[in-house]
Design a protein with these regions (language model features):
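Flavin (FAD/FMN)-binding glycine-rich loop and adjacent Rossmann-like elements that form
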Residues: 2-253
Length: 254
């Protein structure tokens, strides 16, 4: 379409956001191949996935394998973890960010062939977590639901993408427009078309250099209005953009 876009994290010099990194980078958030498990009331342990390493999931909850949790303040029992996404019909959504099935993969500018291969690895990582739940935590009666997705592997059609290209829109909506909307030079709150009410919540736990990134777990923000100009590209007519591709800063995208 010819729409210009940004990828990754802008520096605080670019966006004037005090919690942004000092330098811009192309790092995006982890994605997740969510799994829906069903209780079959019998042992339904899957075949061990290729390259399975239980230590990758060791501190997803409190268990004997977890000796040095990276997030000691966010540790729960296996039962609390598994019921986090409890659904009707004895099903469980597995979308667990703490050493679970989050997976770092920047496929935004990959070819179709490269994406297909990379996404198979992401699927395999989720299967590894399912196998860990079954063999290390004792949930061997839970396995991929056979009546949720019409796919051969019983996984969703696509992963949960937390980040994509963000267009250069008529306006760029930053954290400052949320935290102090009436103090900005551009009164974007006057053009709001939708209301948001969720904290800044970034997933970077599977990125190998996560220690160098800002900690953006549930950074509090007030309710906010989303301006119309974030949906409209700056230089292309007759196009409206939605979801993760609107014109916001990386911080706000989270």
């Amino acid at each position: 379409t010819g729409v210009k876009y940004d990828i990754g994290m802008e520096s605080r010099n670019v966006t004037k956001e005090d919690i942004a990194p000092e330098k811009s980078n192309n790092i995006i958030q982890d994605l997740t191949y969510v799994a829906i498990l069903k209780d079959y009331d019998k042992d339904v342990t899957i075949e061990k996935p290729k390259g399975y390493n239980p230590l990758m999931y060791a501190c997803s909850s409190i268990n004997d394998l977890c000796t040095n949790p990276s997030e000691p303040d966010r540790m729960w029992s296996p039962d609390k973890m598994i019921t986090y996404g409890k659904l009707p019909g004895n099903k469980y959504m597995i979308n667990w960010p703490i050493e679970g099935n989050d997976y770092y993969l920047n496929l935004i500018e990959m070819s179709a062939e490269e994406r297909e291969h990379a996404l198979e690895e992401a699927k395999n990582f989720t299967l590894g977590f399912v196998y860990f739940l079954q063999t290390e935590l004792g949930f061997n009666t839970l396995s991929l639901a056979d009546d949720e997705f019409p796919t051969v592997d019983k996984l969703p059609f696509i992963p949960y993408h937390r980040e994509s290209r963000r267009i250069n829109g008529q306006v760029r909506f930053t954290l400052n427009h949320i935290t102090a909307p009436y103090e900005q030079e551009d009164a974007l709150y006057r053009t709001s078309i939708a209301v948001g009410d969720y904290p800044v919540d970034h997933h970077h736990a599977r990125y190998t250099g996560k220690e160098e990134l800002p900690r953006l777990y549930f950074h509090p923000v007030p309710s906010f209005g989303l301006p119309l100009g974030t949906l409209i590209p700056k230089e292309v007519d007759n196009l409206i953009v939605a979801e993760k591709s609107i014109s916001v800063s990386n911080i706000v995208n989270g």
